[in-house]
Design a protein with these regions (language model features):
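Membrane-embedded alpha-helical bundles that constitute the cytochrome b-like, heme-associated redox core
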Residues: 1-118
Length: 118
């Protein structure tokens, strides 16, 4: 009789669920934005600003972007863990991915919330 010992951190289910949840958030936002563009297509900069000047739209956009970046992090981390076997290179690449995603999140927030002042 063979006894099977299951070890590991069981990140697979959590990652799978996080990717599905972030995908649903992105799909809902995309459908919302598509509906807005179909109902009232923006033709100039003032129309674009009108769409994104509402606080709820900026919050929804930021939630979309955080979901996008979290989704990207999970995917990139899994790709790097699966295909980059040298620990030093993998760690360096993961740090670069994290730093770039943090930078893009802050930059996106700055763009979204700076619209209020413009």
């Amino acid at each position: 009789m063979v006894r099977r010992v299951v070890t590991g951190a069981h990140y697979g289910l959590r990652d799978w669920l996080a990717q599905r949840i972030t995908a649903v958030v992105m799909i809902v936002f995309t459908l919302l934005l598509a509906a807005i563009f179909i109902i009232s297509p923006p033709h100039d900069e003032a129309s674009w600003k009108a769409i994104f000047s509402n606080r709820w739209m900026r919050i929804a956009s930021f939630l979309f972007l955080v979901s996008l970046f979290w989704h990207a992090w999970i995917g990139m981390r899994n790709i790097l863990m699966d295909y980059v076997h040298a620990t030093g290179i993998r760690l360096t690449l993961q740090i670069l991915v994290i730093l770039s995603l943090i930078f893009y999140t802050i930059w996106s927030a700055e763009i979204l919330w700076a619209m209020e002042m413009a």
